[in-house]
């Protein structure tokens, strides 16, 4: 049994926090920069977020194959983590500062450089994010430890992503808004430093485990070509179901937490963005704490599938209440608006439904990531191949293809109601915003959660099943280390009842 030390479980997920710093910046603010600072067209700015997310998805399988083929003195995953972060640093400086040096009279060059630097950033981002999903396979294969990876992964995300979300409105208010160059002059260097520190911690976390003895069951790893991806995906039904579940969760998150949507909800509709955004964000995080503890306990006792299904269902039920409250909202009527002083019944109900719903959802938002490791171990059990890079990037391929729609959907929805500049905290209410917020903030996440529940219905990698898979993989690896061929080991041990007692988990 390959078990991780506590510090490794805590530090390696910081890799996800490091990339989420850039992810949330891109998701929420790059369109503001392109439109407000560079003067690029609104639809171009929002559409480019989708186009580059698609490019990110396309590069995933290629980089996944590179990871699986890589074996250096510095390990398999660490080179991609470090190089990816360096590329993002360079590209961010060029993207957010270099493009401003181009004269407004040469707007065509601004468009070209924006696209090129953005594409370079995507390559670096893919290098590093691919390691979060694939690297965990060598960190631990203990079904009781992998749920802990979820909670530490979420904490790491909060450190990176939460820091940006917390500081952004404060800096925006002091530096002229999200459309100002001054805002990016402070936010980008801060993001670079935070991401670099988190990357360093993640490298320390995986240092001892990034070695060949923790890679799969065979001493030699088969090189899989990119063209074989489709066959692998077709054969691995569990990964297919997880893709649907993960993509649905990511789409819900990318749209419902989009800064434009929140500006319309708390600013234009409730007329108090500065007084509501941070408190409501904190409410969601506070409510998520008990759910984190519950998800870990449920995952350790019944498996990660049971935890994901249970708490996604709770989020779905609670958001029915949020939906009803937003439908009942009345402009200018204090009794039907959010207010933290004085507090009304509408606010109390909203905090309860939103807090419990968001808390339940957020506690499971990153759960598909360690579940990818389960699918990777299942692939090793099924075919004998240790291909965590391919498995992780196959998952993120669909994940990114779907979530890439987020900014475009928001941008298109805003354009449909006649708004030509992305709303910020000071934007006044206009006709159509009410319906747009209801759809983007409530209905889209609810549909995504229903997709998740349907996909998980046929998912077979339960807690007990993963114990069987790990036991079979362990006895095969032991036999191969003693001289047996991979083919013979695959044929000799197929089921739990064939496994010697010493390889079985308690």
Predicted segment positions?
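Membrane-embedded alpha-helical bundles of multi-pass transporters/translocases
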Residues: 1-505
